[in-house]
Amino acid sequence: MNQWMDLAERVLDGAEVTNQEALAILNCPDEDLLLLMHAAFHIRKRFYGKKVKLNMIMNAKSGLCPENCGYCSQSSISKAPIESYRMVDKHILLKGAKRAHDLNIGTYCIVASGRGPSNREVDQVVDAVKEIKETYGLKICACLGLLKPEQAERLKQAGVDRYNHNINTSQRNHSNITTSHTYDDRVNTVETAKQSGMSPCSGVIVGMKETKQDVIDMANSLKALDADSIPVNFLHAIDGTPLEGVSELHPVYCLKVLALFRFINPSKEIRISGGREVNLRSLQPLGLYAANSIFVGDYLTTAGQQETEDHQMLHDLGFEVESVEEMKAGLQSACNTEV
């Protein structure tokens, strides 16, 4: 048994990955990459088999954000030429939900730019979510920014299953990325969502000049937060943002990062998110030996690959898409457990 499979077995037996072991994963010799990914898949298979969860983003409100996040094309300091608009009408949200349902995508993610939602924007999302649930039964994830407890309660009661608010980077690196809100603001929103009964979703953006130790700290912070779903983004540096020109990550390093997140958060949904196509490139399929979830279609202000290419990739891998009906059954089981 090689060192990575030995570590995987210990993780499955309940052991936690030490900092030294985590650094070893990120520093894994390239010639041992397939051994590492095989061990990551050994963990993934225990909890998810060969299933892959599909997610689709609806950019419900674009631009117009007062925050100064250095990676974001929608921020107040960005000069990127993006489309800006206020919260879209309900029929647009319903149209997106129908498309997700028709493509057998189980999770529909409603994302709005800004520091946090106004009560009117929460009203709009609540109104749409009720109809989406009744008509299509999709799993709904909302990502609306910093959240107040009463807003979280309303979203939960309307049928929002999951709330996303990423920590983005390590606490140590946070002030290098933004100064308009704190790391604790982000953590508190995840906790607020969790306290309302929504499933907490929080992830990271790798490639923002952080160290390997920062990446390890991110994975451990999400373990401490007990995030059910962890989107791992790889920076897609956009012209007009402060991080424009930052070099793309090497695909092999991206795979090691995904393996690290699987080892540290063995039972969680690990989703390969923004920047998948430009950073992993031809090695995208290997990422799913560690991750068990992807976004299908476009991201917020950058294009993803065609849905047909994603489905072909999954078919070629021999993986199975979690259908909308399977997702519904899982939600019902979770509801019964809560009762």
Swiss-Prot record:
Reaction(s) catalysed by this chain's protein: (4R,5S)-dethiobiotin + (sulfur carrier)-SH + 2 reduced [2Fe-2S]-[ferredoxin] + 2 S-adenosyl-L-methionine = (sulfur carrier)-H + biotin + 2 5'-deoxyadenosine + 2 L-methionine + 2 oxidized [2Fe-2S]-[ferredoxin]
What does the record give as its pathway?
Answer: Cofactor biosynthesis; biotin biosynthesis; biotin from 7,8-diaminononanoate: step 2/2
Q: Name one GO molecular function term.
A: iron ion binding
Tell me which InterPro entries the record gives.
Aldolase_TIM, BATS_dom, Biotin_synth/BioAB, Biotin_synthase, Elp3/MiaA/NifB-like_rSAM, rSAM
- Annotated Gene3D superfamilies: Aldolase class I
Q: Which SMART domains match?
A: BATS (SM00876), Elp3 (SM00729)
**Keywords tagged on the record:** 2Fe-2S, 4Fe-4S, Biotin biosynthesis, Iron, Iron-sulfur, Metal-binding, S-adenosyl-L-methionine, Transferase
Q: Which domain of life is it from?
A: Bacteria
Q: Which residues bind [2Fe-2S] cluster?
A: 109, 141, 201, 271
**PROSITE patterns (UniProt xref):** RADICAL_SAM
For this chain's UniProt record, which GO biological process terms are given? biotin biosynthetic process
The note on cofactor binding and number reads: Binds 1 [4Fe-4S] cluster. The cluster is coordinated with 3 cysteines and an exchangeable S-adenosyl-L-methionine. Binds 1 [2Fe-2S] cluster. The cluster is coordinated with 3 cysteines and 1 arginine.
Cofactor(s) the record lists: [4Fe-4S] cluster; [2Fe-2S] cluster
What EC numbers are recorded for this enzyme?
A: 2.8.1.6
Q: Where is the Radical SAM core domain?
A: 47-276
Q: Which residues bind [4Fe-4S] cluster?
A: 65, 69, 72
User: Assembly and interactions?
Assistant: Homodimer.
Instruction: Give the family from UniProt.
Output: Belongs to the radical SAM superfamily. Biotin synthase family.
Give a short account of what the protein does. Catalyzes the conversion of dethiobiotin (DTB) to biotin by the insertion of a sulfur atom into dethiobiotin via a radical-based mechanism.
Instruction: Write the protein's name.
Output: Biotin synthase
For this protein's source organism, the top of the classification is:
Bacteria, Bacillati, Bacillota, Bacilli, Bacillales
